[in-house]
UniProtKB/Swiss-Prot annotation:
This is Small ribosomal subunit protein uS7. The keyword Ribonucleoprotein applies. Part of the 30S ribosomal subunit. Contacts proteins S9 and S11. HAMAP family: Ribosomal_uS7_B. The keyword Ribonucleoprotein applies. One of the primary rRNA binding proteins, it binds directly to 16S rRNA where it nucleates assembly of the head domain of the 30S subunit. Is located at the subunit interface close to the decoding center, probably blocks exit of the E-site tRNA. It comes from Agrobacterium fabrum (strain C58 / ATCC 33970). GO terms for molecular function: rRNA binding; structural constituent of ribosome; tRNA binding. NCBIfam families: rpsG_bact (TIGR01029). One of its GO terms (cellular component) is small ribosomal subunit.
Length: 156
């Protein structure tokens, strides 16, 4: 990491259908081997399935799923003397969003529906209703932070 200059954030364009930057970030995270059109069709296909099953606005379901998965605290390792402590720290908003996106996609990929569209739509609907593995991951992270609250004075 450079001490002199911090890396400047790159501008990303909002997605063509909804005009939402978060959806673009989500698409970029789903994309494999630079195949943006495939990622786009997966995300929009999943949104169509969500709209068909829930009769709600897919963007609203997506944002509520992200909010339900996003962690507020996490633990970080801190070495003090000879011991390593798991210190609970608050999560910055950018990292919170990135973790939520990453956990949603990982949970969707682990599901056992046949297509990625079905997996993603299922995970989005589950997360919007506070169910599913992505929400469980958030709960585990919060439990870990709660269990290590005694070490919160080692915060930096």
């Amino acid at each position: 990491m450079s001490r002199r200059h911090s890396a400047e954030k790159r501008e990303i364009n909002p997605d063509p259908k909804f005009g939402d930057l978060v959806v673009t970030k989500f698409m970029n995270a789903i994309m494999l081997h630079g195949k943006k059109s495939v990622a786009e069709s997966i995300v929009y296909g999943a949104f169509d399935v969500v709209q068909g099953k829930t009769k709600q606005e897919p963007l609203g379901v997506f944002h509520s799923a992200l909010d339900n998965v996003a962690p507020h605290v996490e633990v970080r390792s801190r070495r003090v003397g000879g011991a390593t402590y798991q210190v609970p720290v608050d999560v910055r908003p950018e990292r919170r969003q990135a973790l939520a996106i990453r956990w949603l996609i990982t949970a969707a990929r682990k599901r056992n529906e046949t297509t990625m569209v079905d997996r993603l739509s299922g995970e989005l609907m589950d997360a919007a209703n506070n169910r599913g593995s992505a929400v469980k991951k958030r709960e585990d992270t919060h439990k870990m932070a709660d269990a290590n609250r005694a070490f919160s004075h080692y915060r930096w």
